[in-house]
């Protein structure tokens, strides 16, 4: 185990009890690190009711969306796409329909989304290696609806489908559906998936199902993976992946909205505690059963985010840390959710649609796909750069990840570090300083790390920096990854790849994250 010397300055808070040089332990081998992660680890979930807004259609794709995705693709990322969320449970297939169409209820919520062949045909706008989850409506309690969607997805896009998913967050369905009985839920789920398997050509769906897709809410119906596995949901061998959703904060009601602040979402200790207490029991149950597990949907703040929190640079730091928290816990993939305000989620929620009825895009989105009265012009948001950080960190297939212990003297609440291994050798290092740095802060909370022991044979290493003027910066033009910004989808600025100096010191300011790369061939853009 090698040691990374570190010094820090100006941590003028009681949480930092010592000054001077300290050391961060970095194991030189991958023993004890995570499973090997694929280049599809960082994936996406998009609310299907807003599919056309985000992606356009087969003949007219959304230019901004695909420009932003192209930067991920060209760095080697292969994110899977889950057209999922609450509106998948009111989605129907009509063979005579065109592009997806939303039906709005009198209350202003999305009552139904009708899709036709054009919906599936629009998947062809993605590169051939991008796979999809075929999401099926369980909420309307109609086997015909779910079966027809499965058959249509295979008819039009068989080669793109990686998995099938029946229902979204069933723990929040009306309680009378299964009388809060896990066993009744399992029975219906198995009956439906068996029938759908028989209906799909060549038994294509058997053994490709996601199971659970529950939230961590405290509900009377218990259908998290940790509940379903002992109830025998995989007794037929149909389950490939167990899914659970990760939302540690919410603006669905005033009480929870008050807690959805920048300091709270950037508390690393609390994020780890949530992962260990609410997520990992289900993850462990899946792994013990010999199955993969995924975060099938997640974002920082449920019910469409919190303005001035999730639409700031703080969200970028949150995304990087949470994805890596789950990577070290052996999630096979994480699906970052994107969408717009849904009235049905809560009558007390902070967010709303536009006054003219146009979508009120979620403030936790990576980008606003179209101009709108609620959110203004179409543009990338500050959190977009988090995806470039992550795809470059995990650019090599079979990368293993390890969380490093916080050294004595640094705050566990505000610092996290991760080592990346390829072929059992250290290849990269992520250093995330989540101490909130504002315009009126009395310190910039910079920490200095000595990486000289891990530099290559010629003593070299390179740094890419994810930064903004302040943690609450909301102007995407001021947010950069390796010196470049991406507000319009086009690259602005020259790439800045820092070569570590002879002394081996890398500095990380408060509210900043850096990726240290020890192999020249791994440095995109060099």
Protein language model regions, located:
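Fungal secretory targeting signals
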Residues: 1-19, 81, 526
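Acidic, Ser/Thr/Pro-rich beta/coil linker or hinge segments at domain junctions
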Residues: 444-512
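Conserved beta-strand positions
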Residues: 46, 83, 134, 166, ...
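Carbohydrate-binding surface patches
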Residues: 408-456, 468, 511-514
């Amino acid at each position: 185990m090698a040691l990374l010397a570190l010094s820090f300055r100006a941590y003028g808070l009681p949480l930092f009890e010592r000054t001077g040089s300290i050391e961060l332990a970095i194991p030189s081998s991958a023993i004890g690190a995570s499973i090997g992660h694929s280049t599809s680890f960082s994936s996406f979930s998009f609310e299907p009711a807003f599919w056309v807004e985000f992606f356009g259609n087969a003949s007219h794709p959304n230019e901004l969306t695909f420009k932003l995705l192209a930067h991920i693709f060209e760095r080697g990322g292969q994110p899977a796409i889950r057209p999922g969320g609450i509106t998948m449970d009111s989605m129907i297939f009509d063979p005579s329909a065109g592009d997806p169409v939303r039906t709005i209820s009198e209350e202003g919520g999305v009552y139904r989304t009708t899709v036709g062949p054009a919906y599936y045909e629009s998947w062809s706008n993605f590169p051939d290696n991008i796979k999809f989850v075929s999401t099926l409506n369980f909420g309307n309690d109609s086997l015909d609806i779910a079966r027809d969607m499965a058959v249509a997805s295979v008819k039009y896009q068989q080669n793109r489908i990686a998995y099938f998913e029946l229902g979204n967050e069933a723990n929040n369905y009306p309680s009378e559906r299964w009388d809060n009985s896990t066993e009744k839920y399992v029975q219906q789920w198995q009956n439906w998936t068996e029938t759908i398997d028989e209906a799909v050509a060549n038994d294509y769906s058997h053994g490709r199902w996601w199971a659970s897709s529950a939230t961590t809410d405290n509900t009377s119906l218990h259908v998290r993976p940790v509940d379903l596995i002992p109830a025998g949901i995989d007794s037929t061998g149909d389950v490939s992946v167990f899914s659970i959703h990760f939302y540690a904060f919410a603006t669905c009601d005033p009480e929870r909205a008050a807690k959805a602040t920048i300091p709270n979402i950037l508390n690393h200790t609390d994020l780890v505690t949530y992962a260990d207490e609410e997520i990992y029991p289900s993850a462990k149950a899946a792994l013990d059963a010999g199955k993969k597990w995924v975060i099938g949907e997640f974002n920082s703040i449920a019910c469409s985010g919190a303005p001035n929190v999730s639409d700031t640079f703080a969200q970028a730091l949150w995304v990087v840390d949470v994805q890596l928290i789950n990577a070290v816990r052996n999630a096979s993939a994480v699906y970052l959710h994107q969408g717009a305000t849904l009235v049905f989620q809560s009558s007390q929620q902070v967010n709303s649609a536009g006054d003219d009825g146009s979508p009120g895009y979620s403030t936790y989105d990576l980008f606003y796909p179209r101009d709108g009265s609620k959110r203004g012009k179409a543009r990338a948001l500050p959190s977009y750069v988090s995806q470039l950080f992550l795809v470059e960190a995990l650019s090599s297939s079979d990368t293993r990840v390890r969380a490093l212990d916080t050294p004595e003297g640094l705050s566990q609440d505000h610092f996290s570090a991760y080592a990346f291994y390829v072929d059992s050798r250290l290849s990269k290092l992520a250093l995330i300083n989540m101490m909130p740095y504002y315009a009126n802060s009395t310190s910039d909370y910079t920490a200095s790390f000595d990486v000289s022991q891990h530099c290559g044979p010629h003593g070299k290493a390179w740094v890419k920096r994810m930064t903004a003027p302040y943690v609450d910066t909301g102007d995407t033009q001021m947010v950069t990854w390796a010196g470049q910004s991406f507000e319009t989808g086009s690259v602005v600025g020259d790439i800045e790849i820092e070569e570590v100096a002879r002394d081996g010191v890398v500095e990380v300011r408060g509210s900043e994250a850096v990726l240290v790369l020890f192999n020249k061939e791994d440095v995109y853009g060099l």
